[in-house]
Regions:
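Extreme N-terminal basic, low-complexity initiation segments
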Residues: 1-9, 13
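Nucleotidyltransferase catalytic core that binds NTPs
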Residues: 8, 19-237
């Protein structure tokens, strides 16, 4: 029998009639709950949005999320798991969205202010960031959203779905590689944040997992346990 750790919560089923959702009560949709009178005070919540395939999530992802939260004084950072990453369709076989979400839950289980979000799993279909940002604003209308991107992704923003709308919904936070300053389209409000850079990639980690090479200190321990329990990456995907 497969043992599910205490922090594991599978993505909820897709809700068909979204007009009837009580967004504050249905916390699993956005992994956001209504702020209490004292939790965030009177200021608008400052929320980082860090999307990715996270196949698997690794230490580099956490270092980015934690340090951006610190540098920008964010209330929280949501690690948003892509349901169907449109930029990677056909490139390789992905782990299931539910498994990837479970791994992100495991990765952030001990991290204050860093949360797993299944908003894109709940919505279903291709994962377009502009839709995710609009969903988050619907849940918490007064929040400020900060979209966290690597330099390469930021440089290609004009090719994303509805870039003009996206530009109105968030501030772009660019995390560049050392010595590299990526050009970002001028239509976007941009801030650059420097974080410690680790030479870790999900591609390499999948290959290591397939050969049973050690993942310690590259992947959070709860994620390593889950990879083993779920039997992921046995064929290097």
């Amino acid at each position: 029998m497969f043992f599910r750790p205490a922090w594991y919560r599978p993505a909820s089923r897709q809700v068909e009639d979204t007009d009837q959702i009580n967004f504050w009560a249905y916390d699993s949709l956005m992994h956001l709950s209504a702020p209490s009178d004292t939790s965030l005070g009177a200021h608008a919540a400052r929320i980082g949005v860090f999307g990715g395939t996270f196949d698997p999530p690794h230490i580099g992802h956490l270092v980015t999320a934690i340090n951006v939260r610190f540098e920008l004084n964010l209330d929280r950072v949501l690690m948003v798991v892509a349901n169907e990453p449109w930029q990677k369709v056909g490139s390789r076989r992905l782990s299931s969205a539910a498994d990837r979400f479970a791994m992100v839950q495991a990765a952030v289980s001990a991290e204050e202010g860093i949360e797993a979000s299944d908003v894109e799993l709940q919505r279903g279909g291709p994962s377009y960031t502009v839709d995710t940002l609009a969903n988050l604003h619907a849940v918490q209308p007064n929040c400020e959203l900060f979209l966290i991107l690597g330099g390469d992704a930021a440089a290609g923003l004009e090719s994303w779905e509805r870039p003009e709308e996206l530009a109105k919904l968030c501030r772009i936070i660019v995390v560049d590689r050392p010595g590299v300053v990526s050009e970002v389209p001028s239509d976007f409000s941009v801030e650059r944040v420097s974080v410690p850079r680790l030479e870790v990639s999900s591609t390499d980690l999948r290959a290591r997992a397939a050969t049973h090479a050690p993942l310690q200190h590259l992947v959070p321990e709860p994620v390593i346990s889950l990879i083993s329990q779920l039997g992921l990456y046995g064929d290097a995907q």
